[in-house]
Regions:
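Conserved ABC transporter NBD signature motif
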Residues: 60-68, 113
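The feature captures the beta-strand-to-loop junction immediately N-terminal to the Walker
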Residues: 37-39
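Helix-to-loop junction immediately C-terminal to a conserved catalytic motif
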Residues: 52
Length: 247
């Protein structure tokens, strides 16, 4: 379980301190698929980077399973059980997919397990296990290989920052299928995704909306999603709310 207490992050400009995240409180329970959304510039990616240890908070505390990780950097947080997937996955010329999976796992990984991780993200294992992680791979392929490394690592909290960025529609559809499988098979850990995409929001157990550096809405998907979308469900939610107020 991840707990954020009064977490803040600010940067100094020429005149004053600009607050990007302000006294934010958030708990992510174990075995939950949580999506963070909100307007551009609201602080979503900054929050993800603070949780991963890429950015250090200017105030507040971060706890993982009760242990204070506030001062830990990205390497120390990875060792504690937090993984972070970048918007644009890194390419490694000269390194094969199997080598990358073995490095990510942090242990001796056999070929059968490596092929299983690739299969779980919708890749034909025999076609990819010996491929180099280089420019010959598409953005969608790289995203799925990166997710396979997260599975191999077996972390307590897996963070994906706008995983849909830079991939085509076909790759996005495959990505959705991967996340749906991850949601169905989630155990001994949680998934946190930063996204605007309705199809990713629809997979969530919980949705957190961040605007102006603070949480504006938070709750189960079925409670929050209708407020975010101009759909029939939103109209129905509005009607029920109005009728309740009039009763």
């Amino acid at each position: 379980m991840l707990t954020l207490e009064n977490l803040s992050f600010g940067v100094q400009d020429e005149k004053s301190q600009k607050e990007i995240i302000r006294n934010l409180n958030l708990t992510i329970e174990s075995n939950k698929f949580v999506v963070v959304t909100g307007p551009n510039g609201g602080g979503k990616s900054t929050l993800a980077k603070m949780i991963a240890g890429i950015e250090m908070p200017t105030g507040g505390r971060s706890l993982l399973d009760g242990a204070d990780i506030t001062e830990k950097n990205i390497t120390e947080r990875a060792q504690s059980g937090i993984s972070y997937a970048f918007q644009q996955p890194v390419r490694f010329k000269g390194i094969e997919v199997f080598d990358l999976l073995r490095l990510a796992s942090g242990k001796e990984l056999n070929i059968t397990d490596a092929c299983q991780y690739l299969s779980e993200v919708g890749l034909c294992a025999k076609d990819y296990i010996k491929r180099e992680v280089n420019d010959s791979l598409s953005g969608g392929e790289l995203k799925r290989i990166e997710i396979a490394t997260v599975l191999a690592r077996g972390t307590k909290l897996s963070i994906f920052d706008e995983p849909e960025a830079g991939i085509d529609l076909w790759s996005f559809q495959n990505l959705i299928a991967v996340f749906e499988r991850m949601r169905q098979n989630i155990k001994n850990g949680s998934i946190l995704i930063i996204s605007h995409q309705e199809r990713i929001l629809d997979i969530a157990d919980e949705i957190v909306v961040i605007a102006n550096g603070q949480i504006s809405m938070q709750g189960p998907k079925d409670d929050i999603l209708p407020h975010l979308l101009g759909t029939a469900s939103a109209v129905d939610a509005c009607t029920k709310f109005y009728n309740k107020e009039e009763a």
